Amino acid sequence: MPYLYRIAYDGTLFYGFTGHSRSLEPALKRVFGEILGRGSRTDPGVSAVANTVMVSQKLPIALVNSKLPRGVWAWAIAEVPQSFNPRRAKFRHYLYVAPHWGEDLGSMHEAAEVLAGTHDFASFIQRRGEKISTIATVMEIKVELRGDLIYMHFVGRGFKNKMIRKLAWAILAAGRGIFNIRDIRELLERPRPGVVPSAPAEGLVLLNIEYDVDFQIDYTALRSAYVYFLSKYRHAVAHAAALKAVGETLATWEQ
């Protein structure tokens, strides 16, 4: 029987999940051998709490993590049927975080409301060359202000290439007055591929892929990942504050 592992990783350390020698998947293959399936092919710079990989052999999580590179953890395992497809999830939950620079939250909420639902998202997809359906359903988009940060939650069964980053850019653009709600409706009703840029990858995190599967959690591995990300967060906050101080000091020389 195949096995499904939940994987957390720091996306800034890898060139995406797959498709490159510096991607995460080659490191996973060195541990597991063949990868039978994966839950999400995250972009370079995108981190994950609970991506998944399906493999043919059951290995102890402690052994797996001893062989994985820094910034990657397997932290749960489940036995699944031979016919299981990790792409067919109940839903995927992504979070996009951006600094709040005065964006109008009301306009952002309105944009999120328009973009949620079933639409032709051709304006919000970057095609890889293959012919794909551009119709998709976004179950929920939630926008909230937490301190000086904007949190945007995206929930759906599946998302196309660059789709969340483009949706995030459009919602932020609505808050900045770059787009109005009529513009966003027109992008859905009369698609214009290539018009909407992608928001930076580093703000995006895959929080969860939900399945009807009973995972066994390794709490030692989970805590190891938690300590790593908490430590990195503390350093990032200090670095950001230092950069702000540099900018403020430079500005005093202009007076």
Swiss-Prot record:
Family per similarity comment: Belongs to the tRNA pseudouridine synthase TruA family.
Taxonomy, superkingdom: Archaea
Natural source organism: Pyrobaculum islandicum (strain DSM 4184 / JCM 9189 / GEO3)
Reaction equation(s) it catalyzes: uridine(38/39/40) in tRNA = pseudouridine(38/39/40) in tRNA
GO biological process terms, semicolon-separated: tRNA pseudouridine synthesis
Function, as annotated: Formation of pseudouridine at positions 38, 39 and 40 in the anticodon stem and loop of transfer RNAs.
Keyword Isomerase carried by entry: yes
Keyword tRNA processing: yes
InterPro entries given in the database record: PsdUridine_synth_cat_dom_sf, PsdUridine_synth_TruA, PsdUridine_synth_TruA_a/b_dom, PsdUridine_synth_TruA_C, TruA/RsuA/RluB/E/F_N
Listed GO MF terms: RNA binding; tRNA pseudouridine(38-40) synthase activity
Protein name as catalogued: tRNA pseudouridine synthase A
Active site: 43
Keywords: Isomerase, tRNA processing
Gene3D superfamilies linked to this entry: Pseudouridine synthase I, catalytic domain, C-terminal subdomain, Pseudouridine synthase I, catalytic domain, N-terminal subdomain
Record-listed E.C. numbers: 5.4.99.12
Binding-site residues for substrate, renumbered to this chain: 94
